[in-house]
Amino acid sequence: MKALLLARREIVEQYSDRASIVRALFLIALPIALIQLNRSAAGAPDAFILVFALQAGLLPAATAINAAAGSFAAEKEAQTLVPLLAAPIRDIEIVAGKLIGVIAPAAALSIVSLLTFYAAASQRFGAGRIAEVLDPVTMAELFGLSVLFILTLGSWVMVVSARVPSQRAAQQIAGLVLAGVVVGLTAISSVIGNIPTGLIAGGVVAVLVSDLVALQLAQRLWNREEAVARL
């Protein structure tokens, strides 16, 4: 319950900033704009549609980067870190609350983005073709991949945020990560058809292992003694 209350506070603080809302809407609209502006899109192969659907699901998840980047540094600069650490809440509940505050809104944005893309793609490519390419199972897989993406980015950026001296430094790191995400998603379109299934499965397992490592590090860094020592 305490973790959920902390997550609620994180979400309210994150989206009380108008810039955060504008950034989220831009990331939702970007894949839709690209398929509408691409004149050759109507005759594109199914892989083309899947790539843009993947981008539609993953790009809004990048909002999690900024939320996670300020998780420690922002608390320190706002002088709310000590009261938080002094509150009757366990270290694991702090980590869980922060992580839920990162994952929940980004996952919701991914759902909205995928559904919006589905509607726009149906208009562009035809409802019958989109219903076949983006069937419910594929949409669920895209959403699951988005959640994994959010968890991975959120966990590791939270770890980095706990080590930097200021929120500005954390935001700069978040910007670099976001730029890498955009470049990586753009590169997918040229190699997606050549990636073996076994390699994809191995990559997913490696990511899950890295998530566990990041969560363990985050829990250690949010330990009261560790956190107070860095103030």
Report the location of each language-model feature:
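Membrane-interfacial helix-loop-helix connectors in multipass membrane proteins
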Residues: 38-49, 115-143, 195
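A structural motif at transmembrane helix-loop-helix junctions in multipass membrane proteins
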Residues: 71, 130-178
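Transmembrane helix boundary and interhelical loop/hinge segments in multi-pass membrane proteins
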Residues: 14, 65-85
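Hydrophobic alpha-helical transmembrane segments of multi-pass membrane transport/permease proteins
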Residues: 16-40, 51-64, 108, 176-188, ...
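Hydrophobic alpha-helical transmembrane segments that constitute the membrane-spanning cores
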Residues: 31, 91, 96-125
